[in-house]
Amino acid sequence: MGTTVTSRNIFYNVPARRKFLKSDKIEFKHLINEFVRLSLSHHEIEFTLKHNNKPIYNLKRANQKKRVVEVLGKSIEKKIIPIEEKTDLVKIRGFVFKAEYLNKSRNNQFLYINNRYIKSNYLNHAISKSYDGLVDKEIKPSYILFLECDPEKIDI
């Protein structure tokens, strides 16, 4: 067994912080989102997520595609296309969703630099521009992309 992280009543003694918490349901949704982001980028690690002692996820070590399918659902397998490209500056790998499965939601936008999840309007816009002329303007691209580059060349 490796590392175990348990969270219980984390703001029990700090009422000032507790008032910023949303409902248990919303806070658990945030926790699931973080779990998904982390588990997608580390397919070589086993992850288990339990809520009230009920298993939510039990992820074994797997290849990248299998992990994506385990985390995002079996139906995702037919919706994604693997990509890989390497230049002198960056290596890009991951999956993009087929155009017929795109929608107006940004729920399936996962972008990692050196295995670290990031939110970047600039990079998301660049990715969206690659879909110009292929889908309607309101349609958002869906992807799970891993960019690897020299850490000395970027500041995240």
Regions found by a protein language model. Give the residues of each.
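N-terminal phosphate-binding caps/lids of nucleotide- and nucleic-acid-binding domains
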Residues: 1-155
